[in-house]
Amino acid sequence: MYKEEYIEKANIPQNFKIYESRDGMFTDRIGPYFIKGRYPEVILGMRIFEHHSNLNGVAHGGLLMAFVDTIGGYVAAKAGESACVTANLNSYFMKPVPINSWIEGSGKALRTGKRAIFIRVEVMLNKSLVFAADGIWQKINREKGIPKS
């Protein structure tokens, strides 16, 4: 619904396709996100539109955090072979991201334990690091919605 009006405007680079979210309507509302490749070499991309901006006319920090949370969750689920939820996310804002920019993010599982996965996510704009995050994703039992013990 909402994302469809922006898909054509996104002018996506070659080899990206729409990312069909499995995490509910939230991602559909703030996107659209696009995906290229397969785990572990997957990249998510997004065009920054005016409605993604803050009062300074650049990408809102919360948007960037949601973007890396999606990437980290995707990587955690693949690396941990389990449904996961974000337990901790430390964010590092390096440079502002202007409206109409195309950003790309990728993540790497640094460590996979019995109950948690430690992930590093980086967001690039024109090959320049603009945002990064380190996080912990907790494995859960999707049916019960509780952490695995």
Could you describe each region identified by the protein language model?
Residues 1-149:
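Terminal targeting signals and extreme-terminal segments of soluble enzymes
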